[in-house]
Amino acid sequence: MFSLQKKALQHIYMTPENASELSKDLLQHLGLYWNGPIIKMDTVVHLHNKIFSNRSVLKYALAKQANITIIETLVLWVEPEYALAQALKHNRKDVLECIFSYHLTTPKYHHIMHLTSSQELFEFFHLFICKSKNYHARMECLLYAATLYNFQNILEKNREYIIRHSIGNPLFAIACKERHINLIAWFVTAGVLDTYDDSTLFNTAFKLGDYSLLEVACDLPITYPDYLIISMMQTAIQKNYFRFFKKLLTHFSIYRPIIITDAAYYDRRKILLLLLNQNIFNNFTILCALSAAIKGHASKKTLNLLINRLDSQMTVIDSVYYSIIKYNNIDCIPLLMHIKTFRMETLISIAVHGDNIDIIAACKAFLPKDTLYHLVLKMAIILRNHKLFKLYTEKEHPMYIFTILKAIISDFINYTVFQALAIEYLCKFHQEKQLPIVPLLMVLAEHNYITKFKKTCYAANMSDQKVKRALIKCLFIATQKNYCQIFKYCFGSLLKVLSKHEQEKFFNSVVFAKKLASYYDHQNMIQLIDSLIERFRYLLKA
C-alpha cells in the first residue's frame, strides 16, 4: 500500500521553480524552454503542449544522468519492473535504492537481473528481490542466478562456498545448458565439481547441437576413456553431425570397426568416405560394414563406395548373405555381383534355409533357369523343405524336374544320406506324376538302390519291350560300376520274361558284360557272371 505522501508524489505538479532541477539536456530533448508546469496524466507526461510517455522520459533522464531528485519523481510514474530494468541497464544503484524504498513488498524480479553488467549491482539487486530469510537459500539462489546469467566473478568469489556445500555439479549442468563456455571451462578447472561426469558436456553439446561446446569438451585437460569417445562418435553418426564426428576423429584419433559399421548402417556416406580415406580398416572390417549397410538398406552409392574399397579376391563372409536374406534387401544383389567372390549359390542356399521366397525369386534375374532350379531343389531336399519343393515342381514339366533331380542325385554321390533322401523325393515325384518307369529304373541302377530297384521292377510291366531294354542297360551299368546285386536281379528278371529268341541275344549281352567287367577288372562281377552263365546254360542251350 502506498502512503498518502507517495500517492501525492505520483500526481506531482512541477512548477517553474522546480524546473531548474531538470537538466538542460532533458529540457532541450523535450523541445522546451521552460514556461509552464510538467503535468502527469496517467501514462504520459504533458509538457508545454507536448505529450511524452512516462517511460521515455525516465529512460532519457537515466541516460543523461539527470538529478536524482527528478528521477525519484519519474520512477513513481512508471511500473516498478520497468523502473528496475532501466536502473539495472544504466547501473544506477541509487535509483534501485530509491525504488526499493518506495516498494517495500517487491515481487521476485529474477528475470531482469541479467540487464546489469555490474557484479556489485547484481548482488545488491538480488539481496532485495530474494525474500528467503535463510542465508544458505539466499546464497544458493545468488549462485544459480550468477551461473544462469554468466557472472563468473561472483562464482570465483564464492568458490569455497560452492565446494563446501557441494553445489558445483548442478551449477555446471546449468552452465552447459546455457552454453556459457567460459563458465564451463572454469567449473572443470577450478576443482569445484564433486564428481565430474565425462559425458555431461558431450551429451549437452549433442542435445543442443552446439559445436562450440564440443570444442570445449575436446580441449579440456581431461583424459577421456576410449569407450566414451566411441559412444560420442556413434551419437554423431546417428544424428548425422558430420562436423562433430570429424572433430572427435581428428582430436582423439580413435578407429574401431563399430564406427565404420554404424556409419554404413545409417547410410552416412560423408563419414564413411572420411573413414575409408584413412586407409586403416582391413577388408574384413569393410565386409562387416557392407553387411551393416545391407541391413540398414543403405543407398546404392554407399554400397558401391564399400564394394569399390574391397580387395577383389576377398571372400565374401556369410554375414553379407544373411543380411540380404534376413532384411530382404533385393536391390543390393546386382551390386554385389561385381565382387568376384560373391556366390549366388551360397545366397540361394541360405535363402532356402530361411524360406525366403522373395530372394529366391529375385535370383531368377541373375541365374539360368536350370542352375536356379538345381540349387533350389537341392537345398529343399537337404532341408526337407516340402513346401518349397512343391512350389518349384508343381508348375513345371515333370520330365524337366525329373532330369534336374537326376543331376542332384549325382551331386550327392559322396553324401549317402542326402542321396538316399533325394532318391525318396524322386520316387515320390515319379509316382505322383505317373512318369514312365524306364528313366527311374536307370537312375536306381546307376546309384545301386537295390531295394527300390526291386520294388520298381515289381511295379513295372516286365513284358514291355522298353522295360526289357532298360533292364539290359541296367545290366551294363551294374557291370561297369560293379553292382553285383543289381546285375543278379536284372539277370534273373530278364530270364523270366525273355522269349527263346530273345534269350540268345541276351546271352550275347551277358558275354559282352563279362568282357566289360574284365576291362574294369571287377573280379567279383566276373565270378558272378561265370556262375550265372554256368547255372543257366541249360536254358540258353535249350
Curated annotation (Swiss-Prot):
Belongs to the asfivirus MGF 505 family. Plays a role in virus cell tropism, and may be required for efficient virus replication in macrophages. The keyword Hydrolase does not apply. Pfam families: DUF249 (PF03158). It comes from the Viruses. The lineage of its organism: Viruses, Varidnaviria, Bamfordvirae, Nucleocytoviricota, Pokkesviricetes. The keyword Electron transport does not apply. This is Protein MGF 505-11L. Induction: Expressed in the early phase of the viral replicative cycle. It comes from African swine fever virus (isolate Tick/Malawi/Lil 20-1/1983) (ASFV). Keywords: Early protein.
